[in-house]
Amino acid sequence: MAINTEINRLLNFAKQRELINHEDFYYSSNRLIDVLKTAEFVPEEINETLETAAPILSEMLDYAIRQGLIDDTVNERDLFDTRIMDCVMPRPSEVIRRFRNDYARAPKAATDEFYKMSIASNYIRKDRIDKNIIWKTATEYGDLDITINLSKPEKDPRDIAKAKLVKSSTYPKCLLCRENEGYAGHAGHPARQTHRLIP
């Protein structure tokens, strides 16, 4: 598929999942054409409903590799698809505002909506998590959930080599602390551009 169609597919997905509003359409499309280094954009009518953005992101990543924007490694793909999704993410203040409004009405619904947003933004990589093998076993202390984690791919030797070249830094302080919101990441630190915290 043409990259223009993939951009339109992602914008359609983001609107359906309420990551962006109608008013954000051109702002987000312009951010996407910048990240994907394409000069043109033409709005298209898209009629599809997807559970996650993974199929769209896969096409965009393949495009980025063909264009020489990234190398074909797991880490480069993860860094780049997070950068792509950041183009359709609400700002942290908007996420907090929505959460607080929802929480005032129904705390569980607020948490559920935040979780759905985390899946829609690909922060929670549901397509990978669904590959995990999970079962329950009864113990004297109650049921125990056992998971074989297949969602974390093996590191590519090229990614390991790049990580060795990254200058050591104390910023951000940890993988989940506040200063990660919007952090682009690098070979030694995952991208956190879609990371949102509720204080």
Summary of predicted features, one role per range:
Residues 1-198:
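Active-site microenvironments that recognize anionic phosphate/pyrophosphate groups
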